[in-house]
Amino acid sequence: LEKTPRYPFVCIYGIGNALLIKNLAKHYKHLFVFESEIELFILALSTIDLSEELCSGKIYLVDIEEERVDIQLLILFDMKDMFEYLSLYEMFVNNVYYKKFYEDIWHKADELCEKNIKVVIRNLNSSLCIGFECYSHLLQNIPSMLESIPFQRILSQRKNKFENAIVVSAGPSLTKQLPLLKAYQDKAVIFCADGALSMLEKEGIVPDYVTNLDFTDLAMKFFQNKENKTSLNVLSCATHLSLVHFLDNKSVVLRDDPLYQRFNLNDFGYIDTGTHVSHFSYTLALALGFKNIIMIGQDLAFDEEGNSHSKGFSYGEQFNGEKTVPTLKAQAYAGKGEVLTHITWNDYRIKLEYLFACNEQKAKFYNATEGGARINFTEELSFKECCEKLLTKEKPQFELPKSLTKNRSDKLLVKFKEKIQKDQDNAKRFLDDALALKQILENILSKDFILPLEFLEKVYQNIENFNHSLD
């Protein structure tokens, strides 16, 4: 308590007799208690009633030996009231007994938390440049989005119409799967990450959906074949403007995020695009109700020759952009030794495992990559076995859904502009209020005499009101 005044959460190794835990819970919003032996949780709970604290989310009990502990920690640390304070993280130990006899284990718990905190915050750009750029793209893409195919029309016409999907990524293992993919392309709906598109086209394979979320224009190189008139290009609202303008047969989709939902453009949302394009493909397949999702080319690792991508990748099999990222070892597909990956791919893998674990009641995920890193919460099965087992029926053929009428899209654009104008007015008001408070605080600090308590209380209340209005 002395070290953590006003901390919103605390992590403690060891439940002990639970009396200390119950008393500490009164002082924190969340208390995370770690143990390596679930029997100790059971014993403690049999002596002290923590039911109220557990039900309210005051106390979380974490078994560090549980198979899904990484997923649990990612969910917990990604909560809004946790994420903002992760820099305060520290693992405390319940008592001297735990420190003396469980030293290795509580260090393991500490490392587990540190690892998952890094995954949660890794994509946060401290300068916010990426966030601002993506938001800028959103604002500029809105007119094109309103003229594109509404995402909700795609769902209403195609959801739950077929069970089998193949998600194609551009990893080194893809090349060996292409002949079989071509043979079975009429018996599975194909979701293709943009980087794999040219490789499929060279083999005469036409994907049903092509996904993209690049905020840079590097992906322009993937879409050079303008003869493809049947694939539906599903783009994130933050996709680079050049690509949005370049592509036909497109649906520009809003992310499943309050920032985007507040515009009330519900016909064009909402989906979890994730932070890499294959994640987008999986969430799109889930949104469309597919029950069996087969993945190929999802290596998330270098192959034995050091290749980062499949043969025929537009930027080369050994893409230079992958060589500057710090590397590490990961368990290989089917548990056959280890493979070399890097921290970005490893983060992607963990986030995919999170996605698959959260959706295992909705779909079965088959990893038919036959290479690369092992991905938990998937069934590893050869691509040939997947095809023979699941792909027995012809997939349905669909016409491309229609866009909104020009009259309706124009009306939505007018409403959107009105909303943005209100946002600008509010932003100016917040800025003016912030500058006024800053001036007052600077004046207070510059005084060499004690100011009246009533005045200071009023300033404090103004700061509290300002913070509340930001929430």
What are these regions (language model features)?
Residues 1-165, 172-188, 199-202, 218-230, ...:
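N-terminal donor/sugar-recognition subdomains of glycan-related enzymes
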Residues 5-9, 163-167, 207-208, 259-270, ...:
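Short, basic, glycine/proline-bearing loop/turn elements
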Residues 9-14, 165-169, 190-192, 211, ...:
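Structural motif
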Residues 35, 196-197, 204-214, 285-309:
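Glycine-rich phosphate/pyrophosphate-binding loops
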Residues 35-40, 194-197, 212-219, 236-240, ...:
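Short, acidic/turn-prone active-site loops that include or flank metal/cofactor-
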Residues 45-46, 178-179, 202-205, 212, ...:
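Short acidic, glycine/serine/threonine-rich loops at helix termini
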Residues 241-300:
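Active-site/ligand-binding-proximal alpha/beta "capping" segment
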Residues 307-355:
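Phosphate-binding loop/pocket of nucleotide- and phosphate-handling active sites
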